[in-house]
Every structure is written in C-alpha cells, then in structure tokens.
Amino acid sequence: MYSGGENAAPFNTLVDPAPRGHVPQMSEKNTGEKGGGYMLMKPLVETAEKLGVRAEYDLRVQTVVVDGDRVVGVVAKRYGKDVAIRARKGVVLAMGSFAYNNEMVRSNAPRIFGHPAASIEAHDGRAIQIGQALGADTAHMDATEVAFFCDPQLMVRGILVNGRGQRYIPEDTYPGRIGQATLFQQDNQAFLVIDEAAYEEGMNAESSSAQLRAQPSWVAETVEELEGEMGLPAGSLQSTVDLYNRHAAEGSDPVLGKKSEWVKPIVGPFAAIDLRGRTGGFTLGGLKTTVDSEVLHVSGAPIPGLFAAGRCTSGVCAGGYASGTSLGDGSFFGRRAGISAAR
C-alpha cells in the first residue's frame, strides 16, 4: 500500500511511486483499547513469556535507579504503591511521546498546542523527562505530525477549500499532509464541498476509516446558495467550483494535480462538510540515541545501561511522517535496544 502521499501530486511527478507500506494480516482485527497496539503486543509478550521472560503488568515507571553513572533499575507505581525492579544489564525506555503533556507541547511544539492529541493519554513524556534528568540529549522536539479526521473516501470525491473558498491541496494525498496544510497554513479552516452523487458513492465505498465519515453541515441547490450558507466571501466558492469543473470535464486537475480517476465535475445538489478543527497532532521528537538504541548524554557519550526506542526517541520520521513509521521505527530499534541491553 501507499503510505505517505508518494502516489499523489507533486511527488508522483518527480519519482515513479511504489507501494512500500505493508498491512499486517491479522484475524479478528479490533479497534479501540484492544486494537492496533494491543494486537501487536499480545503475541510478542506471549512469545516472550513462553521463553521464560517474566512480564509485569499494571506498572507505571516513575524514575530510574542509578549506581554511579550506570542505570541499574527502575521505580514504578502499581495501584499507588512503589515497586522497585533491579535491571542487571540495562533499562529500555519505550513509553511513547509527549503529545499529552501540555507543558512540554507548549514549550517544544507550540504549533499543535491546544489541539487534540492523535494518540492516547499514556503519551505523557515521562520517558523523555527521565532521560533528561540524567543529562540525556534530545533532538527534533519541535517536530510534529497532524492527523486529519475525515474519511479519505469522501475527501477524494470532493474538493477541500479553506476559509476563503479556495482549494489548497490535492484531496487524494496522504491525510497527514492535509492535516499539516490545514493547521499550519490555513488556520485550521477546512470545508469539504461535494455533490450528492459523490457523497453517496463515498459513503458506500469500502473504507478503513468509516468512523471518520460525517454528515453534511450545509446543503443547497446552487453553489451560490451553499457559499452563503457557509459564510464564505461572495463569489469565492463559485469561482473555485467553476474552475475545477472546467478542467474536470476533461478529467484533469492542472491546478493541484489530483489524479484523474477522482476528478469529476461537481454538480447539484451540493453539500459541504465543516472540517474546521478536525485536526489532531502528535509529537515526533525525543531522546537522542545511537543506532544501537543507546541514549546519548548531552556530552555525546552513551549513558551506561540506558536504552530507548519508539516515540520517546527522535527516530527516523522526525523530518516528516508516513503511515506506520512509528511501528517500523519502534519495532526495529526496539529489537536493537533489547540486543544492546542483553550484551
């Protein structure tokens, strides 16, 4: 599968796109609390336990224990009580990002401050703070990704316009790119304009994001009427739709480059979905590590006995995100962290 907009403009005009993303084939897939993370961790933990590894549950690490300059264990909370655990060879931090730590977000990634975090509340930045307390260095703490909460099956069949009634991004690109463009460049103002036939087609299409489908916020027989209902500048949406339809009649989108398979004239009845504020950010920066997942001190030297992986580190996607990168990053460097700690 395509995972980061590589098959959309402008990237598909620069390099021939290739689907390099992978969807794990899992039986009885779930969403929610027993969704992605749970389904990935369950077989890993079960396999480890069969090999004799002891698993502890309902623990929340508070700090690490240091003997001299070496990390030798952790102190955690379980049901309000402290639990100390000795680590003979090392401690691996894999506790998520800081997307739910408002103060850390305000200080390091203010562009997403005040917007819903597209992650779970356990992403509180504690692992980063634990590392920093030992003098650990960090990198790309301002790096973020922005999710956009709308079903792509609807977006590709309509046009996304900003608060001035203008299109600003190809609707068939990676939703993360749409999220960043909407929040950072359009003041979080976005509307999906779509006609009745395209809306019904999108609602009936197979989708991995059906929970993100939305009902129209406004409906009208003409674009002029819809424009007025939406409170857009007079004539702005009309000119946008007219230009889009002129080229769509020939199956092209020379303005933004949406692929021809999704380009069709928008004809009445018309609808618009209010997508203002439908963005949620998460953080990509974190602890600086080596290729062996050793946490680096600000001096540049590894902190003995301390390793880290996943979103609490500044991984491969700090400069930009693609779907699944956190899983790839976390699993690859998590394995390297385990190997390094076991030496």
Each language-model region and where it sits:
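Hydrophobic alpha-helical segments, especially N-terminal targeting/anchoring helices
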Residues: 65, 161-162, 289, 296-297, ...
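Internal hydrophobic alpha-helix adjacent to the cofactor/substrate pocket in enzyme cavities
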Residues: 128-137, 233, 238-241, 248, ...
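Conserved redox-cofactor binding core of oxidoreductases
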Residues: 1-82, 102-104, 248-267
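Glycine-rich phosphate/pyrophosphate-binding beta-alpha loops
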Residues: 147-154, 173-179, 278-284, 311-327
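A glycine-rich dinucleotide-binding beta-alpha-beta segment and adjacent secondary-structure elements
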Residues: 236-320
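An anion/pyrophosphate-binding glycine-rich loop and adjacent beta-alpha core
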Residues: 124, 128-130, 137-236
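Rossmann-like flavin
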Residues: 1-16, 218-237, 242-243
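Glycine-rich loop(s) and the adjacent beta-strand/alpha-helix scaffold that form part
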Residues: 35, 78-148, 327, 333-336
